[in-house]
A protein has these predicted regions:
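A mature extracytoplasmic/lumenal domain signature
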Residues: 169, 184, 193-197, 222, ...
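Bacterial N-terminal signal peptides that target proteins for export
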Residues: 1-9
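Beta-strand/loop substructures that line and gate deep hydrophobic ligand-binding cavities in soluble
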Residues: 200-242
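Hydrophobic ligand-binding cavity/cleft-lining segments
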Residues: 25-171
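Hydrophobic/aromatic beta-strand elements that line small-molecule binding cavities or substrate pockets
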Residues: 177-184, 213-219
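A conserved amphipathic terminal alpha-helix motif
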Residues: 236, 241-264
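Bacterial N-terminal signal peptides
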Residues: 9-18
């Protein structure tokens, strides 16, 4: 009887351990300096204001090489690049969520990054206007680029290989369609947003089709998520446009982070 109880306890123990056996520490993906700053502040951000296109915060993720394949084409324009790296405690997500489970998995994160409709009505702080504004008046998946019929979020099951199309009515850029591609394994989810339409600010066409990317990689690190957000776009070399564009895109990254941590 005692042997049977010991065997059961061992099975339970190894079962629990196996849930985290593939989850690596976030320290395996970043250097000591970045790890220390993440531990202290929870975020590390770099805005590239020169001609360098090197992504200095991109962790050594499995999908990092895939991200590098999905960057905007280098052109004779001003290129804006923003990198943000977040260390997120899963317990903080659970406190704000409707989940009844005792942890958050990569499957949960996969569902969230495909819950595009939950972006609708989300707000951001406009650095230019110095006020809170609605970022997306509309945000939903569509059945195709041709018919553009609204459909429910396709956010169940494994996301690997999924291609979706999205329509968003953006406070800064107006109505725009995006192509979304997803890649997923047992520990990570990677999503890349690519604009299908040109994007404008007022009377100016600021961003050409396929000239904007929003890259999102989430990796499970046991009791934490390591979240990497990168935005980049080409735009005219006009100081006024550049300033407004940078303010808008930085605020957008902050809004995407809030969407990720609050949509469970």
């Amino acid at each position: 009887m005692k042997k049977a109880i010991k065997l059961i306890n061992c099975l339970i123990f190894f079962g629990l351990v196996s849930n985290f056996s593939f989850a690596e520490s976030y320290k395996n993906f970043v250097n000591e300096e970045i790890a220390s700053e993440l531990e202290e502040k929870g975020i590390k951000r770099i805005i590239h204001e020169d001609s360098s296109r090197d992504l200095v915060l991109l962790p050594n993720f499995e999908y990092s090489s895939k991200l590098l394949e999905n960057r905007v084409e280098e052109k004779k324009k001003y290129t804006f690049i923003s990198e943000s790296l977040y260390l997120i405690d899963k317990s903080e997500i659970l406190e704000k969520s409707n989940l009844s489970q005792d942890t958050v998995t990569i499957e949960d994160a996969s569902r969230v990054v495909r819950s595009i409709s939950k972006m609708e009505g989300m707000t951001y702080y406009s650095l230019h206007r110095k006020e809170e504004s609605i970022l997306y008046e509309k945000s939903y998946m569509i059945d195709s680029l041709e018919t553009q019929n609204r459909i429910d979020d396709v956010n169940t099951g494994n996301a690997d290989g999924q291609i979706s199309y999205v329509l968003q009515d953006d406070h800064s850029f107006g109505e725009c369609r995006y192509e979304l591609r997803y890649f997923q394994n047992e520990n990570s989810i990677y999503a890349v947003f690519k604009n299908v339409d040109s994007m404008g600010m007022g009377i100016f066409r600021v961003i050409d089709p396929e000239d904007m990317r929003i890259n999102i990689i989430v990796t499970d690190c046991g009791d934490k998520f390591l979240l990497y957000l990168e935005t980049e776009t080409n735009c005219p070399k006009n100081k006024l446009i550049i300033n407004k564009l940078e303010d808008s895109l930085i605020a957008r990254v902050d809004a995407i982070y809030k969407w990720f941590v609050s949509s469970y």
